[in-house]
């Protein structure tokens, strides 16, 4: 999808991360990333050469996918319950998961962090690891696009004690980042 494409674009030539595996639904599994995405590539930059020939794995084959990676960026199109379950399955393979999905945003032991604002929220990971029975695996989520944009500004304004803040968003109707 669009978020996966954005991940691929942002991770191209990244100094810390290398995309070694892509996973999607059974419908795309077995195809190359280029075949699976095809004309649906919507980024302004071309599809990175490094991912074009990667064979898409089935996201539901958790053990197999997790054995090929050290870290998972998650942006899947499933029900919230399915997302929660599969992200925790990945975490239980001792694979850290950073999720773009909203499913875990209200899970008490899953941190939702804007690092410059609330890095202390990472502390809840230890409680999550106990619940999941993991030593390395966990799930962390990012806030929605509006909150992550406003949080730094609102935090800076706190010292001025505003009594009213009006925020307007112009989000994509689809919620898929299409503007």
PLM regions and their residue ranges:
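N-terminal Rossmann-like NAD(P) cofactor-binding subdomain of oxidoreductases
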Residues: 1-179
């Amino acid at each position: 999808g669009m978020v996966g494409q954005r991940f691929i674009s942002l991770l191209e030539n990244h100094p810390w991360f290398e995309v070694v595996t892509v996973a999607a639904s059974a419908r795309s599994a077995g195809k190359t990333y280029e075949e699976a995405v095809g004309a649906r590539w919507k980024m302004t930059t071309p599809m990175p050469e490094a991912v074009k020939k990667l064979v898409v794995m089935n996201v539901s084959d958790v053990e197999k996918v997790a054995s090929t990676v050290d870290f998972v960026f998650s942006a899947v199109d499933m029900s919230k319950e399915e997302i929660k379950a599969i992200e925790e399955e990945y975490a239980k393979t001792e694979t850290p998961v950073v999720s773009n999905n909203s499913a875990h945003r209200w899970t008490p032991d899953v941190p939702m962090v804007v690092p410059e604002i609330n890095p202390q929220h990472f502390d809840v990971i230890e409680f999550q690891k106990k619940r999941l029975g993991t030593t390395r695996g966990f799930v962390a989520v990012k806030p929605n696009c509006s909150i992550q944009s406003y949080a730094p500004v609102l935090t800076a304004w706190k010292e001025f004690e505003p009594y009213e803040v009006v925020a307007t968003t112009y989000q994509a109707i689809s919620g898929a980042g299409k503007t």
